[in-house]
């Protein structure tokens, strides 16, 4: 019985070692990053199209601050659809001959972009709350409703983007150890470059 347990343990160790090696290959990492970027861009596009559709339908029937809420959703998501469309066009084809350096650079550049976007998202949400607060002090009802509707929309859209960008940041950040293992396979010395397999 002890031999069976030891054998199972040995097999599991070998399998996990093979998996650890296979998930640190450059093609695997490139493919995984490509899929993550494509999926997140498709999610943004889906969110935007859904908002455009729902707010487009609701705008004709809305009044008061609801009218302005749907109007701002339309403005906001026209931009989001454009961003998602450009992103999807850029992701039509995976880079067939990446270098370790280019993959690492792209990985960390994307993380920095997501953190910058997170800062912008916080600014959007804050601006939305400012508009909501401003709506309470407006003298005319039309301006009050406009600020309220626009503020609600900016809070909703900024809140979505905040969750979206932070989630993407943490997903991409979780790939950093895999990249580090890949980099650990390469070492430089005065005599040349050594690659471990």
Where does each model-flagged region fall?
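Canonical alpha-helical transmembrane segments
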Residues: 54-58, 79-94
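Long, highly hydrophobic alpha-helical transmembrane signal-anchor segments
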Residues: 47-69
């Amino acid at each position: 019985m002890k031999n069976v347990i030891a054998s199972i343990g040995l097999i599991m160790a070998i399998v996990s070692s093979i998996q650890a090696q296979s998930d640190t290959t450059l093609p695997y990492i490139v493919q995984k990053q490509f899929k993550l970027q494509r999926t997140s861009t498709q999610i943004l596009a889906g969110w935007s199209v859904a908002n455009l559709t729902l707010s487009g339908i609701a705008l004709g029937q809305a009044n008061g601050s609801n009218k302005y809420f749907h109007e701002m959703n339309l403005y906001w998501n026209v931009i989001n659809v454009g961003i998602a469309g450009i992103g999807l066009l850029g992701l039509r084809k995976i880079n067939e001959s990446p270098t370790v350096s280019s993959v690492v650079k792209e990985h960390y550049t994307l993380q920095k972009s997501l953190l910058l976007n997170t800062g912008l998202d916080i600014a959007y949400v804050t601006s939305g709350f400012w508009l909501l607060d401003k709506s309470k002090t407006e003298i005319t009802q039309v301006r009050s409703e406009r600020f309220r509707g626009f503020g609600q929309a900016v809070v909703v859209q900024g809140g979505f983007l905040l969750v979206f960008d932070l989630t993407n940041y943490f997903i991409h950040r979780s790939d950093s150890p895999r990249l580090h293992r890949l980099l650990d396979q390469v070492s430089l010395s005065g005599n040349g470059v050594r690659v471990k397999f």
